């Protein structure tokens, strides 16, 4: 069995483009920041990828270190939010509250751990303005026509995180460059806001923050100038994370900002990029309306976080069948809580969160548990809990998604038929239930049922 304290976690660092041992700045308090949602619509399966990556990382870190401070922001001021509220004829605050609550409900349904701190951008405007003021003062930002822009040429390592050359980025740009920019690569820290849109008074006039400064200000507010891990989807690597790193390191030159960068791969649907026009675009809620949560969770765990994950309904059904077998093993082996984690599972997760290998390590335990090995069943339970699985009892799992009252009524009818020696009717009821995937088990205490 594994001793979590003796394991060494090796994580791929996007910045160094290599897998390396994770060494926290303070082993007594590991500090982690993940970019959260922009709350203008229901979260979709692609959004879920980063949240699952963060969840497994946080679960693992909490088995290895005494304290983990996990911060995940909510972006509640954004042009997409403004446009959607106008399209809906809805108040902006009503839209952001509704979609934030829906986001929380979706993640809770999937047993994803909440962050310790969940700052909202609109609650940290003063923190953003303080950073912007420092950047203007030290020459890394400038004011132009009511905008404040970051001067990328003044930060020599700009592009280092994403592996891009600034000159190549500018040469490849096809968008029209705003005339007030000194350099085409300069990005907005603050911009003017129209009277009918959210805005705050500032030394630069009434306006609102740019996207990138929001995360820099909130991570600094709760985690300081240096923290351990910054994560998110690889679609955020450039420009968002590149710009975060630049403005934070220029604002606080004695800090390291994030010492380790973790990025997850993207999601396909039936082998193609999700698109409403292709009919393969699904929100989390749409999937959970058709399936229990744990199969979706297992499907995500079945792909390494840095690889591309391909969603399909067939794969979701296969994940459900796998869970049927694992839950059956827990039941047969009479799994008990409190067992140490299996070494094979810890070793897999400590190797860059290798969840496919961790899932593979569950199957030998399930094989033994199916033969009545209680130790194996208990180890299986402990491993599954670390992975965020086995959130219900086997009895609850096998009775989910069926009409329990209708089954109980048929069992009572069968009992009455047997008492009246109408064995043909009793056998017909058993056969009817078996055809629906329900197995009856007669014992001294009466008849119980389970999904086959």
From Swiss-Prot:
Q: Which CDD domains match?
A: CysRS_core
> Which InterPro entries is this protein grouped with?
Cys-tRNA-ligase, Cys-tRNA-synt_Ia_DALR, Cys-tRNA/MSH_ligase, CysS_C, Rossmann-like_a/b/a_fold, tRNA-synt_1_cat_dom, tRNAsynth_Ia_anticodon-bd
Location relative to the cell: Cytoplasm
Indicate whether Metal-binding appears among the record's keywords: yes
Chemical reaction(s) catalysed: tRNA(Cys) + L-cysteine + ATP = L-cysteinyl-tRNA(Cys) + AMP + diphosphate
Q: Which domain of life is it from?
A: Bacteria
Q: Write out the similarity annotation.
A: Belongs to the class-I aminoacyl-tRNA synthetase family.
What NCBIfam families does the database record attribute to this sequence? cysS
Q: What name is this protein filed under?
A: Cysteine--tRNA ligase
Its lineage opens with: Bacteria, Pseudomonadati, Pseudomonadota, Alphaproteobacteria, Acetobacterales
């Amino acid at each position: 069995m594994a001793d979590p304290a003796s394991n060494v976690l090796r994580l791929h660092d996007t910045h160094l483009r290599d897998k390396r041992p994770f060494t926290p700045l303070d082993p007594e308090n590991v500090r982690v920041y993940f970019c959260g949602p922009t709350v203008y619509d229901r979260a979709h399966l692609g959004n879920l990828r980063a949240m699952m990556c963060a969840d497994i990382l946080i679960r693992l870190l909490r088995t290895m270190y005494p304290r983990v401070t996990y911060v995940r922001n909510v972006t509640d001021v954004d042009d997409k939010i403004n446009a959607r509220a106008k399209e809906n004829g809805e108040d902006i605050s009503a839209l952001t509250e509704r979609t934030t609550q829906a986001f929380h409900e979706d993640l809770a349904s999937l047993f994803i751990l909440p962050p310790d701190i969940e700052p909202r951008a609109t609650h940290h405007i003063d923190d953003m303005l303080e950073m912007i003021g420092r950047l203007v003062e030290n020459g890394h930002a400038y004011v132009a026509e009511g905008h404040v822009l970051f001067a990328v040429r003044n930060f020599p390592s700009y592009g280092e995180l994403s592996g891009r050359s600034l000159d190549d980025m500018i040469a490849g740009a096809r968008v029209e460059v705003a005339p007030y920019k000194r350099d085409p690569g300069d990005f907005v820290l603050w911009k003017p806001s129209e009277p009918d849109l959210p805005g705050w008074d500032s030394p630069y006039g009434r306006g609102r923050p740019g996207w990138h400064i929001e995360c820099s200000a909130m991570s600094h507010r709760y985690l300081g100038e240096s923290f351990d891990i910054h994560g998110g989807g690889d679609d955020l690597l450039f420009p968002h994370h590149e710009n975060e790193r630049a403005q934070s390191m220029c604002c606080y030159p004695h800090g390291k900002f994030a010492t380790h960068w973790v990025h997850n791969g993207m999601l396909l649907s039936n082998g193609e990029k999700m698109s409403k026009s292709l009919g393969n675009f699904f929100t989390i809620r749409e999937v959970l309306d058709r399936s229990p949560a744990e199969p979706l969770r297992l499907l995500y765990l079945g792909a390494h976080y840095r690889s591309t994950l391909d969603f399909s309904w067939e794969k979701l059904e296969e994940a459900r069948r796998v869970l049927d077998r694992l839950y059956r093993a827990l039941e047969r082996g009479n799994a008990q809580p409190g067992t140490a984690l299996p070494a094979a599972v810890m070793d897999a997760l400590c190797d860059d969160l290798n969840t496919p290998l961790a899932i593979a390590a569950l199957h030998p335990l399930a094989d033994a548990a199916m033969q009545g090995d209680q130790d194996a069943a208990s180890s299986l339970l402990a491993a599954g809990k670390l992975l965020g699985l086995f959130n219900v009892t086997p009895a609850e799992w096998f009775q989910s998604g069926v009409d329990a009252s209708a089954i109980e009524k048929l069992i009572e009818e069968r009992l009455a038929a047997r008492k009246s020696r109408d064995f043909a009717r009793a056998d017909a009821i058993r056969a009817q239930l078996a055809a629906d995937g329900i197995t009856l088990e007669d014992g001294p205490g009466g008849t119980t049922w389970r999904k086959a």
